[in-house]
Amino acid sequence: MAADNSKNAAPTALRRELKARHLSMIAIGGSIGTGLFVASGATISQAGPGGALLAYMIVGLMVYFLMTSLGEMAANLPVSGSFATYGARYVDEGFGFALGWNYWYNWAVTIAVDLVAAQLVMAYWFPDGNGMLWSALFLAIMFGLNAISVKGFGEAEYWFAAIKVTTVILFIGVGVLMILGIVRGGAPEGVWGNFALWSQGDAPFAGGFSALIGVAMIVGFSFQGTELIGIAAGESENPAKNVPRAVRQVFWRILLFYVFAILVISLLIPYTDPHLLKNDLGDISVSPFTLVFERAGLLSAAAVMNAVVLTSVLSAGNSGMYASTRMLYTLACQRMAPRMFSYVNKRGVPTMALLATT
C-alpha cells in the first residue's frame, strides 16, 4: 500500500545555513576519528598489511555506492529526515518509522559512549580527575554548539574536522619521508627494506579470508558518519548543487586518507608488533599514529595525538547530537513521535528534540 505522502512532507521550519564546505567537512569529520587513529592498528595486526588495505578498499567501494545513492535522493528531496523519510515515502511508513527511531537511538547511545571515551582521553593528563565532571563539561559543550544555530554547529564541525584532516595529511607526509629515508625511523636497509615488511611471516594476507571478513566490522565502524550528508542536506544552501559535489569530494578524500594512512603504517610497523593489536583509548601511546611520529623523533607525540583523539571524540559526539536531534524532529513532523519534538525556536533549532536527545 502506498504511503501517505502528506505525512512525509519536507519540514520547512529549519534554516538552510550550511554551505558546501560545511557539508564536506561534516561527513569527513564523522568518518575520520578513533577508527583510524586507534583501531587501524588492529586491522593490520589481524589481517596483515595486504588484508587491511584490501578491507578498507572493499568497504570504501561499498560506501561509494551508498553515498552516491543517498546523495541522489538527498539532492532530489533534501530533508533532515533523510533515509527515514525516503523509507516512509517510497517503501512503507512502518519501515521509515523503524529506521528513524533506530537511527535516533543509535546516535543517542553513541553520544554516551563518546562521553565515556572523553573521560578516558582526559585521564591521560588528569589521572586523578573526576570522570563525571569531564563528561558533564563535554556534554554541555556539545549541547551549546547545537543550541546556538545550525550555522554554529557547521562552523564547529568544520574546524574539528580540519584538525583531523591536517593530522592525517601530516602523518602521511612524515611517513613518506621516513619510507624514503629522508627522515629517520624507516628501515635501515633503505626504501625497499620497508617493503620487506609485506613479506614478513604470513604477510601480506595474515589469517586468510576469515581474517579479512573479521576486520570488515572494524573498517565499517571507521566509515560510520558519511551518511551525515543526507541529514545535513535538509539545512544546506542549494542542496541540488552542493550535495552531489560534497558526496564526490568526500568519498575520494576519505578513501585516499584511509588507504594512504594504512599503507604508511604497514610499511613502517610490522604487523606482528604487539602494540598494533591494542585498541585502547586509555593508552594513546599504542596508536599507530603515535608510534610512527615517535620513530620520526617528534617529541610529545603521545600528548599531541591524545589532543587529536579528544577532538575526534568531541566531533563525533557533536555530529551525533545533531543527527539524532534532526531525526527526532523529523519523526515528530511526520507524526511518528510526539508533536512537542517538532518545536523549532527562532534560530531554527529544534530545541525540544535537542533536550530529549541530551
Question: What feature does the model see in each segment?
Answer:
Residues M1-A10, A84-G94, L115-S135, T167-L170, ...:
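Helix-loop-helix connectors at the membrane interface of multi-pass transporters/channels
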Residues M1-G41, S45-G50, Y64-T68, S80, ...:
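Membrane-interface "cap" regions at the ends of multi-pass membrane proteins
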Residues S24, A52-M57, F97, M132-L137, ...:
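Hydrophobic alpha-helical transmembrane segments
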Residues A42, L54-A55, V63-A147, G152, ...:
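Hydrophobic transmembrane alpha-helices that form the core helical bundles
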Residues Q46, L115-F143, I182-L212, N279-D283:
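Inter-helical loop and helix-membrane interface segments of multi-pass membrane transporters/permeases
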Residues T68-N76, D128, V150-G154, V176-A187, ...:
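Transmembrane helix-loop junctions in multipass membrane proteins, especially transporters and channels
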Residues T85, D92, Y124, L197-D202, ...:
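TM-loop-TM module centered on a large, flexible mid-protein loop between adjacent transmembrane helices
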Residues M132-G193, F223-Q224, V247-L255:
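Membrane-interface loop-to-helix entry segments
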